[in-house]
Amino acid sequence: MSFGSKVSRALRFLEIPVKDRASVSFLKNPDLQPIKSANQTWGFWSNFAYWGVMSFSVGTWMSASSALGVGLSYPETIGTFIVGDVLTIIFTLANSCPGYDWKVGFTLAQRFVFGIYGSAFGIIIRILMSIVNYGSNAWVGGLCINMILDSWSHHYLHLPNTLSSKVAMTTKELIGFIIFHVLTAFCYLMKPYHMNYILIWSCVATFFSMLGMVIYLAKQAHGVGELFTSTKSTATGSTKAWAWVYMISYWFGSVSPGSTNQSDYSRFGSSNWAIWAGTICALLIPTTLIPVFGVIGASTCDKLYGEQYWMPMDIFNHWLTTNYSAGARAGAFFCGLSFVLSQMSYTISNCGFASGMDLAGLLPKYVDIKRGALFAACVSWACLPWNFYNSSSTFLTVMSSFGVVMTPIISVMICDNFLIRKRQYSITNAFILKGEYYFTKGVNWRAIVAWVCGMTPGLPGIAWEVNNDYFHNTGIVNFFYGDSFFSFLISFFVYWGLCLLFPFKITVKHDDKDYYGAFTDEEARKKGMVPYSEISEEEIRAYTLGEGYTTGHEYRPEGSDDEIPELVKTSSENTNEFEIVHHKNNEKQSSTASEKAA
């Protein structure tokens, strides 16, 4: 057997297995197709929990600790978080539309806007973000694992470190990190849309654990401490105004990856109301409440123990090391269990499954969500996440500023959805190489240019954030502070303007039939589509399995006499006009349609 034959055989072996009515190809696998209507089960609490799990977390508990660094008081910082939440809600809900309109995820939404090949830009960025965030969250999850193990054994609590001093972690931390990874890996055996109950229960458990901690500390300290009143704003005038802008932008930037791929989870929604109400409540209530818990925790610890503990794990470590009582051990165990569940839920939904969905979009023939998630889990070790927390690494600073890169992507997607395509997309064409979304050589250069224009001005600000001594330019720094606002507007209007100046042909507004069973009969008819239940088996196979492929835009079962639209551009260059010529029994009928770019 030749080397080429061996490679081909190995590649065939690596192809993902598929069931009936499913196929894999260069552009398609079952995980990329629209979600079946039967699996769109996420109601209010599921959507609330998806965003709530980000807030009922150790990271959000610690978030207010960044306040003093920019010169704001803690109450002012909570105010910036609330404004940042409103901004996040607007961006997130606007970016939810491809998911709840057409039941597709981030990968297909990228193809709609950036093109079949151009979509790789945003997808790769999201994958890198997911992998790094996976490592970071897994490390914190490992610390939560150690809370449980510490409560079990006094010897484990004082386990000696056997690692070299050159490694920025201890033996205990390594053990917790490994255990967390192993536990998380088993969860990828489930489908993403089955995870909603885990998300809900993790939010409930973590909320009551955090509430119990705050009540206990406040009772012991006879109040909430003095941090809310003793810390004063050191910034004044325009400096204070820009500090507000920075914290708002920072707060949005920390969750911008989730806003970017919101379609991955909005497609699971049972109704638009459930998505909107759940997302709004989750991005307003816990994101405000949990940072307040964190301030109370640090304030009461300062009064009780003479030190501000911002990480819940540090609080329990103090309790266990000073008094290894049954009460302290029980508290560490149950709170540690809820924190582990919270970190697992967040890591799986926002990092593991997210990267799995994205990798499935890059290599759909060989990668499904499960394989992609496991790959991200393995590669996350290469990020050396222990250096993020146990050394002087500036990587977390850079990561918190990554909204500079993500916000322009969100902006272009929103502009295309509302102003250019008017919320109309053809799902079948997202699986065709030279179809509706091929644009220019597979790339929508207008979207790429708009993304670059919105991203580039903020890059010097990231360099300044890493090292303030690089340069001293107030304009660049202030632009970076407000990047979430400025980059969004720049990319939005640049893309809109380019589409007006250089319009592309919108030849297919949406599919005429629900080939994937993504809608109920009533929903399909409202969208002007033939319901799935009324489509023949042969036609479904033609579209979902790729049998009978006949043209660059449509599928047809072989030997069928059904009408096949052949799309022919008209002479107009300034509008998106096209002529649809229907062929049936060698007879032609013509019709003309015109769609403007904006």
Curated annotation (Swiss-Prot):
Compartments, as annotated in UniProt: Membrane
Modified residues (Phosphoserine): 560
Disulfides per UniProt: none
A Pfam short name: Transp_cyt_pur
Gene Ontology terms describing biological process: 5-amino-1-ribofuranosylimidazole-4-carboxamide transmembrane transport; nucleobase transport; thiamine transport
Comp. bias regions, Polar residues: 588-598
The entry's keywords: Membrane, Phosphoprotein, Transmembrane, Transmembrane helix, Transport
Topology with respect to the bilayer: Multi-pass membrane protein
Function in brief: Responsible for intake of thiamine.
Full protein name: Thiamine transporter
Organism in which the protein naturally occurs: Saccharomyces cerevisiae (strain ATCC 204508 / S288c) (Baker's yeast)
Source organism phylogeny: Eukaryota, Fungi, Dikarya, Ascomycota, Saccharomycotina
